[in-house]
């Protein structure tokens, strides 16, 4: 009998167990999960709605040392395969702007269907057990957890990374992978908020506004994204900030000075802003600078933009000199923020970095160093952007690894 041990009961581990059990009905499949319940992170995804995947599924939406690795995995288990898999569980889905959610809009529905299938497939689940070591023996593997020994012919490492420790990912999987001979690219927080040094917008905390943000290393733009940015007391947040955060985190890890350029009027070029301001001034010749900006920006943001421009709030807009107008336009379009840190692993949605993908076969997720060992999900040096891409990665790698583990001769 093929004994398949899965370390980690998150998204990729659960799907790996189902795929393994479906592929080999005689296999003895079991999951070891250190939290009291499996699938805790699934419940937190998509603000509790579980953004399963995305219609615009492309390898360019993933980052890592080897971009081709993600492409090869997704060719085998992509958007269509994910929908088919969840349909086989009985899940109805819907699209919201290309983002795929359960029709119920509840992540709990997704987890419950996965748990129902685990029971149907007679997968044994051990919760509240922390894996301490993984050893190779003459007869396969031995997993040590809380003083117990779990022998296995195949092992799937689905432990997750270090992001959101409260949901079960504490980085312990990296040590297990290392013990099997694997190496890691630097692991840093990704899809995370950024902390700003000498934060000029701290008093505007709570403001949400459309903006384009760009990650800068010197004059080089590493990445940029547009959307709703949130100003916090310590820095900046929101989806566009999350999308560029991995580049900032990598730079900070390497000891580089990292900046973010913020454009508060992304829908207009600077020349268009200049023209719009002139037209606006013709209509409001008696407005103070505070009043002039009232119809353009959120109230709490206006004093901060004027402060950056060295302009008094009650100064008549009609009396501003050309150089002052340019300072104001620069503040609106090209504010530079120096980033001192990310908001850490505990607040990150995922990690950038992990087990180097060159050490894993992309068609099976099997280790090149240890026969019968498979690595999935966030443990690998692949992470996606916001929008269902990281769950897609978990489903895909979990399914391929589970199937391969069951079918391996």
UniProtKB/Swiss-Prot annotation:
Biological process (GO), any one = bile acid catabolic process
Pathway given for this chain reads: Lipid metabolism; bile acid degradation
Query: Which EC number applies?
Result: 1.3.1.114
Q: What is catalyzed by this enzyme?
A: 3-oxocholan-24-oyl-CoA + NAD(+) = 3-oxochol-4-en-24-oyl-CoA + NADH + H(+); 3-oxochol-4-en-24-oyl-CoA + NAD(+) = 3-oxochol-4,6-dien-24-oyl-CoA + NADH + H(+); 12alpha-hydroxy-3-oxocholan-24-oyl-CoA + NAD(+) = 12alpha-hydroxy-3-oxochol-4-en-24-oyl-CoA + NADH + H(+); 12alpha-hydroxy-3-oxochol-4-en-24-oyl-CoA + NAD(+) = 12alpha-hydroxy-3-oxochola-4,6-dien-24-oyl-CoA + NADH + H(+)
Q: What PANTHER family does UniProt report for this protein, alphabetically?
A: OS12G0638800 PROTEIN
Q: Which family does it belong to?
A: Belongs to the BaiN/RdsA family. BaiN subfamily.
Known function = Involved in the secondary bile acid metabolism. Catalyzes two subsequent reductions of the double bonds within the bile acid A/B rings of 3-oxochol-4,6-dien-24-oyl-CoA and 12alpha-hydroxy-3-oxochol-4,6-dien-24-oyl-CoA to yield 3-oxocholan-24-oyl-CoA and 12alpha-hydroxy-3-oxocholan-24-oyl-CoA, respectively.
Please report the name of this protein according to its UniProt entry.
3-dehydro-bile acid delta(4,6)-reductase
């Amino acid at each position: 009998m093929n004994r398949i041990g899965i370390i980690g009961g998150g998204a990729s581990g659960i799907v790996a167990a189902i795929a393994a059990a479906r592929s080999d009905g005689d296999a003895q499949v079991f999951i070891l999960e250190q939290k009291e319940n499996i699938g805790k992170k699934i419940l937190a995804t998509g603000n509790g709605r579980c953004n399963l995947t995305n219609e615009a599924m492309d390898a360019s939406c993933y980052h890592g040392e080897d971009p081709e690795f993600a492409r090869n995995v997704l060719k085998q288990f992509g958007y269509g395969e994910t929908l088919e898999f969840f349909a086989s569980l009985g899940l109805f889905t819907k699209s919201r702007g290309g983002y795929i959610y359960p029709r119920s809009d509840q992540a709990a529905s997704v987890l419950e269907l996965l748990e129902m299938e685990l029971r149907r497939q007679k997968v044994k689940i051990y919760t509240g057990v922390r894996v301490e070591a993984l050893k190779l023996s003459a007869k396969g593997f031995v997993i040590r957890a809380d003083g117990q020994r779990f022998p296995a012919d195949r092992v799937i490492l689905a432990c997750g990374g270090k992001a959101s420790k409260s949901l079960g990912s504490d980085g312990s999987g990296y040590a297990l992978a290392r013990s099997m001979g694997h190496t890691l690219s630097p692991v840093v927080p990704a899809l995370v908020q950024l902390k700003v040094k000498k934060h000029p917008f701290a008093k505007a905390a709570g403001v949400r506004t459309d903006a384009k943000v760009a990650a800068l290393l010197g004059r080089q733009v590493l990445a940029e994204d547009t959307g709703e940015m949130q100003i916090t007391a310590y820095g900046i947040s929101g989806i566009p900030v999350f999308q560029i955060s991995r580049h900032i985190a990598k730079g900070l890890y390497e000891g580089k000075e990292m900046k973010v350029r913020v454009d508060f009027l992304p829908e207009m070029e600077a020349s268009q802003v200049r023209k719009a301001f002139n037209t606006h001034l013709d209509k409001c010749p008696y407005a103070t600078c505070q009043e002039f900006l009232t119809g353009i920006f959120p109230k709490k943001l206006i004093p901060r933009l004027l402060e950056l421009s060295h302009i008094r709030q009650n100064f008549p807009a009609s009396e501003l000199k050309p150089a002052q107008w340019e300072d104001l336009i620069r503040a609106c379009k090209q504010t530079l923020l120096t980033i001192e840190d990310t908001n850490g692993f505990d607040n990150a949605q995922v990690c950038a970095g992990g087990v180097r993908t060159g050490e894993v076969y992309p068609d099976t997720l099997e280790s090149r160093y240890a026969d019968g060992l498979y690595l999935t999900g966030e443990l690998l040096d692949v992470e996606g952007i916001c929008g269902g891409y990281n769950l897609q990665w978990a489903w895909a790698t979990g399914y391929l690894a589970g199937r391969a583990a069951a079918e391996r001769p």
